[in-house]
A protein has these predicted regions:
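Active-site-adjacent substrate/metal-binding segments within catalytic domains
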Residues: 1-67, 71-108, 144, 207, ...
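Extracellular glycoside hydrolase catalytic/binding regions
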Residues: 113-228
Length: 228
């Protein structure tokens, strides 16, 4: 049972002190959490030290999100980040999987970022396959994983670079009941959410020809300044 955790606190930004990380870890364990996705970038070593000590399982990933560029410097940076992440975290027993991408596909909005981001499907599939193979080369002992957006088309493309054992597990970011409507907030609504999650997972299992899928993001947005 896991959660995503950002390295961020009000007043500190990304430079979260270790005592506040302990506070976060205590809260997660009180919730019954035993797995963490260090979203969406490698965290400081103290986070993984705590996970080692507490027996937490960790999904560690590079900040390769949404878009691929045709620029060679962009592609080189992604692969360098991957190698650095694996080599820095290799000796942490808590880390059980390396994440190679998060929601990377071909959104129509990519054109707004410039012509370098207008890539074709073959380029995307070829490059992401090479990223997965690089991760396997760097570490043969851990799972290679990824997260994808809740979209049939995006996952069909993603499945093309995931085949032949390139990627061990794929997760889908499913915000059912938050980014989709639910009829009520009672038992009927909960059943509706459960049924929708099961339906989507079964659909994506078929897309990837997989026996299991991860839910890599879930829940709802929150704001400490908003109260019911």
């Amino acid at each position: 049972h896991g959660v995503g955790m950002h390295q961020d606190r009000e007043g500190y930004g990304n430079a979260v002190p270790d005592d506040l990380k302990v506070q976060d870890m205590n809260l997660m364990q009180e919730m019954g959490v035993n797995a963490i996705r260090t979203s969406h970038y490698p965290h400081s070593q103290s986070t993984y030290n705590l996970a080692d000590e507490r027996g937490m399982l960790v999904y560690c990933e590079i900040p390769y999100y949404l878009l691929l560029s045709n620029a060679e410097s962009y592609k080189t940076s992604i692969k360098e980040e991957l190698k650095e992440m694996i080599r820095q975290g290799y000796n942490h027993p808590s880390i059980m999987m390396w994440g190679i991408e998060n929601e990377v596909y071909q959104p129509a909005s990519a054109a707004a970022f410039g012509k370098d981001f207008q890539i074709n499907e073959n380029t995307l599939v070829s490059f992401n396959s090479s990223v997965a193979k690089l991760a396997q080369k760097e570490d043969t002992t851990r799972y290679i994983v990824q997260a994808q957006i809740d979209s049939s088309n995006a996952n069909k493309v993603c499945a093309k670079w995931s085949k032949n054992g390139n990627v061990d597990y794929t997760g889908v970011n499913l915000y059912v009941g938050f980014k989709s409507s639910v009829s009520s907030a009672d038992d009927e609504g909960r059943k509706e959410i459960t049924d929708t999650l099961n339906r989507k997972l079964n659909e994506y299992k078929q897309t990837y020809n997989a026996s299991s899928m991860m839910i890599t993001e879930y829940g709802a947005g929150a704001n400490i300044n908003q109260h019911a």
